[in-house]
Amino acid sequence: MSLADSVLAINNDLPIRTDSPVHSGKVRSVYWLTDADSRRLITTKGYNVPEDTPLAIMVISDRISAFDCIFHGEGGLKGIPGKGAALNAISNHWFKLFAENGLADSHILDIPHPFVWIVQKARPIKVEAICRQYITGSMWRAYSKGERVFCGITLPEGLEKDQKLPELLITPSTKGILTGIPGVPAQDDVNISRSDIEANYQAFGFEQLADIDLYEKLLKDGFKVISAALAKLDQVFVDTKFEFGYVTDKDGNSKLIYMDEVGTPDSSRIWDGAAYRDGKILENSKEGFRQFLLNHFPDPDVLLNKDRMPEREALARDNDLPLEAMMQVSRTYTGVAEKVTGAPIPLPANPKADIIKILREEYDLIV
């Protein structure tokens, strides 16, 4: 098996029994199970959900996206070795820690394979729940241009790049393109304020106004749990994005849960603590890959300017990135995962074959 064979780049072609189109995201693909298979698994596996809950198989890939494009490397390498397994392992660890700390549940019911989650269908909140402890990234870019109000929050004068903020800040943005909300442009990833959410809470998917307080509490509490755990590893939890949704419990009540992934190098910035104390930024997240791309291509504006999206897509499609750059990302992701979980990350030689075998023999889901 070659290195390229160990990478799961295409994850939307598995022969999983479904009666709905496969939903393919940038990194994960979702296979909605038939009603019969959902009910069978809920009964036979003892999942703690109502018997009519729709279930899905969520399969992560090793693809790497940045600036809304998928990149690939030399030698037919269509993704990052170990990336998918590392992301899932990190999220699994944090979700377990959340449960131990009495926080909300997640959408995950079962983990058949390092690349696979069995999840319950949730009603998503249409908010990217972003939490920041340091001023960097888009917040710093806005601040350095003189902006002092960010997502409805007034920032103090005199802040310096990459410094710790006086308090943990929630700076939400829209999830997807939302139309018909006063004062909110119909664009993806638009910064919004808490006031925007309060005035239009149902349009953002909140079932009641009080749940805005709950989502903010779960976001901050989750951030603090991860930050404290990473601090013990001398890693700095800089900022992160969570997602939330509603599910119905066995008593018929709605409850707010964590969705997607949490505290990963894809959804967060993580800095090396020793380097930060020396005045340097050593990224242990996808931000390092983004910075590599900005330095690698002669015209970085292509990656930053949304008006040049066709050029950006062609750039990603037509360029094989150096193998060493891809492997550096692999070392970053698997290194963070091994630090967080305290265990090596499994790198199956043929992940697709392994997934099919497990889902056939242990779940009877392969056609």
Swiss-Prot record:
Family named by the database record: Belongs to the SAICAR synthetase family.
Pfam families linked to this entry: SAICAR_synt (PF01259)
Native species: Shewanella baltica (strain OS195)
Cellular component, GO, one term: cytoplasm
Transmembrane parts of this sequence: none
The protein's name in its UniProt record: Phosphoribosylaminoimidazole-succinocarboxamide synthase
Superkingdom, natural source: Bacteria
Keyword DNA damage found: no
Keyword vocabulary terms for this entry: ATP-binding, Ligase, Nucleotide-binding, Purine biosynthesis
Assigned EC number: 6.3.2.6
